Amino acid sequence: MELCDDTLLRELAKTKNGFTVEKIKEILLQLNNVFKKMHENKIVHRDIKLNNILIKYLNKEKTKFKVLLSDYGISNQINSLSKNLKTYAGTQIIMAPEILSNSKKYGDKCDLWSLGIIIFKLKTKKHPYSGRKDNEILDDIKEKGQSVLDVIKDDKLKDLLSKLLVINPDERISWDEYFNHPFFK
């Protein structure tokens, strides 16, 4: 494993109002290479969060960097017989609704939800939803819905988030749709 300089969470804490849209895009484009490999190998991370995204600076000015995803401890592979996972795993505040609700089965779209939460936090420095227990977080998600996106001013970023933060995983954007979203063009 490579030696990294910091986590994305600590870098975010150093900003006044969150990252610019351009910086978010730069980070995501690098992470997308990791996500594509995970998707191709049917790996679900289940704990994508800012503390698990590492930064390695490539110059002293910290203008060039490499982004890595860490902590695959609770990741799992979806096999061809069962396209779903069943284990309750992850960090509560970032967990997809289908995991929080103890749904009997969930798939790789749970990582897309977590990614939406992370992107929102990178832009605003805040979590879109709150609560200390699963049912409190779920209630907040249902109550606020996508109205939390009103603070996002960039149209393409807002559209991407509106497709990631969809309660019903069957209606949530797919990985292929995510990779091809206009935000990345």
Where are the model-predicted features located?
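Conserved activation segment of eukaryotic-like protein kinases, specifically the C-terminal portion
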Residues: 85-99
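Terminal C-lobe "cap" of eukaryotic-type protein kinase domains
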Residues: 166-185
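Activation segment signature within eukaryotic-like protein kinase domains
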Residues: 27-28
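Catalytic-loop of the protein kinase fold
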Residues: 39-56
